[in-house]
Regions:
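Non-cysteine beta-strand/loop elements that form the S-adenosyl-L-methionine
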Residues: 319-337, 427-438
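Flexible glycine/proline-rich, aromatic-decorated loop/lid segments
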Residues: 341-345, 425-462
Length: 476
């Protein structure tokens, strides 16, 4: 984010009360910003065709601020208006900041992120942007110099989509790191790369069967090459020592503090297992959450889901909400795990994996919906999206009242044109990530071909069909 634009994204508190909140005038505001270019974003939404709302502060010369001063009291917006109007909210203890024309925006809300991973990755080897196996290994070496023998070296960020036709192997990684198990997670988490010591620690050898919905890449002799795809990744990641509760809380706080510095006021945690959820609850009870958390329980953690079916949705806290569940229906386009209606263009005979074969529990998902929880289902391929729509429509048909829970399809990345019109009638939100379009640009058409790619990243087409969209960065 451009720091001169942020002052900082409305103080990381959110635009929760725009105008006229004049309570507590006697003591005055806690904080006042003056002489800013304030964009309240309180005008109407764009039309389905993208036309700007009639009441938006926009003309032929561009966008214009609709206020210049903001008053804050007890973590809430007290007043928004002109610098002169704001004077009534001055008190003896008010801090006033002249922002000298800087842009002030409402706090940001990210609707799909992985907070603990965002924090954890700050202490792992960062491989984002590496172009070759050798570059990746050099970066691991530079970042892990001095690591004691036997200790795990963990990194992340190599692009499984970009590297899918030339995956590395354990050979060079093992030569460089003979005395440490090394596990390197891909950019989106749908592939992992390990050295031989890591494979041995995890008990992965030529006899290891592939789990449903996963692949262990093997050489001509049947030995694992060091690359595990989709659900097979857990065979290796499970061998890495779990963080302590204190470390996990630290990862979560690091992730949230990183977001707070960039102007976020709330985040949707896309999948929280028991340990993560309990950490959120401890942090909330101690008043330590710096950003509001909308926790989506992990459907893969059945015990946690059963616990919350008994408890019911939790919405009473100002800092932690738990009324949603995250599920995976298929895998990723980059790893060719997303479920397609027809063969992958660059792998004839292969259509990806979905549903029960990818660990989707239809019965538990329906129970969670019927217990009052919103569900957000990860679906990327056109078949994955179609089958997810089939499932959601069937549950809603038997329980029409649950449509009000605003169920979601996470990513909705490749949607067949025949299915675009099915979202809105069922009230299903398309929770999409514009960065994926940019990240996948170099290989997406290779995967699905020139015709199917027209249904990929189809934000405007979905919006024209009346579908509610929510955008996010899929931070991790």
């Amino acid at each position: 984010m451009n720091r001169s634009v942020a002052v900082v994204a409305l103080l990381c508190i959110g635009l929760t009360c725009l105008v006229g909140c004049r309570d507590n005038l006697e003591s005055g505001a806690d904080l006042i910003l003056v002489n800013g270019r304030v964009y309240t974003l309180s005008w109407g939404e764009p039309a389905a065709d993208g036309s700007i709302a009639f009441d938006a502060p926009h003309d032929e010369s561009g966008w214009h601020p609709d206020a210049e001063a903001v008053a804050v009291k007890d973590g809430r917006i007290l007043f928004v208006g002109t610098s002169d109007e704001i004077e009534i909210h001055q008190g003896g203890a008010t801090q006033t900041i002249d922002v000298h024309g800087a842009t002030v925006l409402p706090g940001f809300v990210d609707s799909h992120a992985h907070i603990q991973e965002l924090g954890r990755e700050r202490v792992q080897v960062n491989l984002v942007g590496v172009e070759t196996e050798e570059d990746a290994i050099d970066r691991v070496a530079a970042s892990s110099d001095g690591t004691p023998d036997g200790q795990w070296i963990v990194g992340w960020g190599w692009d499984e989509g970009e590297w899918a036709n030339r995956y590395p192997t354990a050979d060079k990684l093992s030569e460089r790191f003979p005395d440490n198990p090394v596990m390197l997670r891909s950019l989106h988490g749908f592939a992992v790369w390990g050295n031989r010591m890591a494979l041995a620690e995890a008990g992965i050898d030529r006899q290891t069967p592939e789990p449903d919905g996963g692949r262990i890449l093997r050489d001509s002799a049947g030995n694992p090459t060091g690359i595990l795809i989709d659900r097979a990744t857990t065979l290796l990641t499970a061998a890495v020592p779990e963080p302590t509760d204190e470390q996990l809380e630290g990862f979560i706080l690091t992730g949230l503090e990183t977001m707070a510095r960039d102007g976020y006021v709330a985040v949707h945690q896309a999948g929280a297992d028991s340990r993560i959820m309990h950490a959120f609850e401890r942090l909330e009870a101690d008043g330590r959450l710096p950003v509001r958390v909308y926790a989506m329980l992990s459907l893969r953690d059945e015990a946690l889901c059963r616990e919350w079916i008994e408890r019911g949705p939790y919405t009473s806290s100002t800092m932690l909400t738990a009324r949603s569940v995250k599920a995976y229906y298929d895998a990723a386009l980059g790893s060719r795990g997303a479920r397609m209606l027809e063969d992958y263009s660059d792998r004839p005979g292969h259509r990806g994996v979905s549903g029960t074969n990818y660990g989707f529990d239809f019965d538990l998902a329906a129970e969670m919906m019927q217990a009052g929880f919103q569900i957000g289902v990860h679906a990327i391929g056109d078949a994955g999206n179609r089958e997810t729509l089939d499932f959601l429509e069937s549950v809603i048909a038997g329980n029409p009242e649950i449509m009000a829970q605003r169920h979601r399809i996470e990513h909705a990345q490749v949607v067949h044109p025949d299915d675009i019109g099915r979202f809105a009638p069922a009230g299903i939100i398309a929770a999409m990530q514009p960065p994926h379009c940019v990240e996948d640009m170099s290989w997406a058409e290779d995967r699905v071909g020139p015709e199917r790619v027209k249904g990929a990243y189809a934000w405007r087409t979905l919006r024209k069909a009346g579908v509610h969209l929510t955008f996010s960065a899929d931070l991790a």
